[in-house]
């Protein structure tokens, strides 16, 4: 069987990472409202709600030793601005959620390949990873 094209393989890796974070959040009592929510300004990987808090979670799945410190450097100012605009679009479509306290979290997932196969691990979860300016 032919290997997946690189883009499809990376997309699948990202989807698996999002699944791990989704499971983690559910175990923490969060209700997932959306996954891979898209708008003209970008995509929100996960949107979740618990009590009076709404979180927008950016998930980065990387192999060990990645150039961007496990995905953390990929969430720079331009990416943060896109996430904020996407969150504003999400809230405009879900006005009943606009009174909740909102925050932006970042989840870092590590993908490890070995002879036994591929495994994933949540390396770090950063609540309120950046401020809304």
Curated annotation (Swiss-Prot):
Recall the GO molecular function terms of this protein's record: nucleic acid binding
Which HAMAP family does the record associate with it?
A: UPF0102
Q: What is this protein called?
A: UPF0102 protein CYB_2119
PANTHER family (alphabetical): UPF0102 PROTEIN YRAN
Fetch the Gene3D superfamilies from UniProt: 3.40.1350.10
Name the family. Belongs to the UPF0102 family.
Organism per entry:
Synechococcus sp. (strain JA-2-3B'a(2-13)) (Cyanobacteria bacterium Yellowstone B-Prime)
Family matches, as Pfam families: UPF0102 (PF02021)
């Amino acid at each position: 069987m032919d290997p997946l094209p690189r883009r499809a393989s990376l997309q699948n890796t990202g989807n698996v990472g999002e699944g791990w974070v989704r499971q983690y959040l559910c175990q923490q009592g969060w209700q997932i409202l959306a996954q891979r929510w898209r708008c003209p300004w970008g995509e929100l990987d996960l949107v979740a709600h618990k009590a009076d808090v709404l979180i927008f979670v950016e998930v980065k799945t990387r192999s060990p030793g990645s150039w961007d410190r496990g995905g953390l450097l990929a969430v720079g100012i331009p990416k943060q601005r896109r996430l904020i605009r996407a969150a504003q679009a999400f809230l405009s479509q879900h006005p009943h959620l606009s009174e909740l306290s909102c925050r932006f979290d970042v989840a870092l997932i590590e993908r490890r390949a070995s002879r036994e196969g591929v495994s994933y691990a949540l390396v770090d979860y950063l609540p309120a990873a950046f401020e809304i300016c």
